[in-house]
Amino acid sequence: MPIHEFQVVGRHVPTERDANPKIYRMRLFAQTSIHAKSRFWYFLSKIVKMKKSTGEILNVTEIFEDKPQKVKNFGVFIRYNSRSGTHNIYKEYRDLTRCGAVSQMYDEMASRHSARESSIHIIDIKEIAASLTRRANTKQFHDSKIKFPLTHRIAKSKSTFVANRPNTFFC
């Protein structure tokens, strides 16, 4: 299921003591709005002394990319729990959208570090200029004269019958 970006707004339930409680807003990456609300309560309980039973969700909206046809560089600050402890990491990705960059990050963290989505906390994600990129993997695409190999350009017509026997010996 693809990842979407949500903005979740919530607060404490108003009481006689506090008629206008403080409002909290978070931008979260999740597959569904239900999962985003769940992550909102998870992070809010870590930051403020509040939980789902004493709070209310005011609004959940999906955030869409302004220019989804333009390739951008994204810097992602994350914190994740591994078998040996908690680590802070900065990673860079090139993608069309923030959600695409986060999907790349989740795939890479799962393959390289065996870190699952539940153990990864995205602290910040920013669109960064080409001059501010740090990683060589991202910088290699900033060349204006970059060339890629164009493979299998000639379409070869295959005949119905072939004059020689098939080769079954492969090294």
Swiss-Prot record:
The keyword Ribosomal protein is assigned to this record: yes
Keywords: Ribonucleoprotein, Ribosomal protein
GO CC term (a single one): cytosolic large ribosomal subunit
Molecular function per GO: structural constituent of ribosome
InterPro entries, A to Z: Ribosomal_eL20, Ribosomal_eL20_dom, Ribosomal_eL20_eukaryotes
Annotated protein name in UniProt: Large ribosomal subunit protein eL20
Source organism of this protein record: Dictyostelium discoideum (Social amoeba)
Pfam families registered for this protein in UniProt: Ribosomal_L18A (PF01775)
Domain of life according to the entry: Eukaryota
GO BP annotations listed: cytoplasmic translation
Family, per entry: Belongs to the eukaryotic ribosomal protein eL20 family.
